[in-house]
């Protein structure tokens, strides 16, 4: 079977390394490549994918929303998130999924077993935040809180959550068991500070969905304060495993995928 990841730029993507490691571990001769498709060429997506004879593909920045009009069907999670990161091509039909939310939550559950009883704050209200929020809301016993700079961003949400400003979030930080940053602040080349951690409780798990850099400024600050931290590496690995399951109906080798990504990040 043939797979790929599409984006622009795409040369930095670790998806090929991760998926190939999984294929090798499972003894599969499947292939996975990175395809750079600029925005101005995206209208040719059907033609490009058809020529490659792909069975499925991942989509990353900046095409996660742009792909939707080209799909024959979009699953509920992707509709809720307003973004697609996985496409299955079956019987000529393109089916869109979003595995980011379930990928993050599966990873988080592995480091925070009592997740159901946690009081959680999500920073940011974009597509990534939405996907994670919908997944968490399925089983959390306490109402989820989401903070954003502008309240207008919540107009497209139809989830029963506490909506607060980032300024209010700073004041109430001590109340939360887990704080999750879903904004681009801290991504390589972006040193913007999203929130002041002055009131962060020492017992709070500070998380970020970014994994490059391995420790974002907000994670470094929380770690200096003595907090446990959790980056986005597991989310990346688990969302990839979920994509593989959608494409092949097989379980991925999580350990081989994570090891391959870690080796790449360490420059091995």
UniProtKB/Swiss-Prot annotation:
Pfam families: SDH_C, Shikimate_DH, Shikimate_dh_N. GO terms for cellular component: cytosol. It comes from the Bacteria. It catalyses: shikimate + NADP(+) = 3-dehydroshikimate + NADPH + H(+). InterPro entries: Aminoacid_DH-like_N_sf, NAD(P)-bd_dom_sf, SDH_C, Shikimate_DH, Shikimate_DH-bd_N, Shikimate_DH_fam, Shikm_DH/Glu-tRNA_Rdtase. The keyword NADP applies. Shikimate binds at residues 13-15, 60, 85, 100, 211. GO terms for biological process: amino acid biosynthetic process; aromatic amino acid family biosynthetic process; chorismate biosynthetic process; shikimate metabolic process. The active site is at residue 64. Keywords: Amino-acid biosynthesis, Aromatic amino acid biosynthesis, NADP, Oxidoreductase. The keyword NADP applies. Pathway: Metabolic intermediate biosynthesis; chorismate biosynthesis; chorismate from D-erythrose 4-phosphate and phosphoenolpyruvate: step 4/7. Its EC number is 1.1.1.25. NADP(+) binds at residues 76, 124-128, 148-153, 209, 232. Homodimer. This is Shikimate dehydrogenase (NADP(+)). It comes from Staphylococcus aureus (strain bovine RF122 / ET3-1). The gene is aroE.
């Amino acid at each position: 079977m043939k797979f790929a990841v599409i984006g622009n730029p795409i040369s930095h993507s670790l998806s090929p390394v991760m998926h190939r490691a999984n294929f090798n571990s499972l003894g599969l001769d499947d292939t996975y490549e990175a395809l750079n498709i600029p925005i101005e060429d995206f209208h040719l997506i059907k033609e490009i994918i058809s020529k490659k004879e792909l069975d499925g593909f991942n989509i990353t920045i900046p095409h996660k929303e742009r792909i939707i009009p080209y799909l024959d069907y979009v699953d509920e999670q992707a509709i809720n998130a307003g973004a697609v990161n996985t496409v299955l091509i079956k019987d000529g039909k393109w089916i869109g999924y979003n595995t980011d939310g379930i990928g993050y939550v599966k990873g988080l559950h592995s480091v925070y077993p009592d997740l159901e009883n946690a009081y959680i704050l999500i920073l940011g209200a974009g597509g990534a935040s939405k996907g994670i929020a919908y997944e968490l809301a399925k089983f959390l016993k306490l109402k989820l809180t989401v903070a954003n700079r502008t309240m207008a961003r919540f107009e497209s949400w139809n989830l029963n959550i506490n909506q607060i400003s980032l300024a209010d979030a700073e004041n109430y930080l001590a109340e939360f068991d887990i704080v999750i940053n879903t904004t681009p602040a801290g991504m390589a080349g972006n040193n913007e500070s999203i929130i002041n951690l002055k009131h962060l409780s020492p017992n709070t798990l500070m998380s970020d969905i970014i994994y490059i850099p391995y420790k974002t400024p907000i994670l470094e600050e929380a770690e200096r304060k003595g907090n446990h931290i959790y980056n986005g590496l597991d989310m990346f690995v688990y969302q990839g495993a979920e994509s593989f399951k959608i494409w092949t109906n097989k379980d991925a080798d999580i350990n081989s995928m994570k090891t391959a990504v870690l080796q790449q990040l360490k420059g091995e």
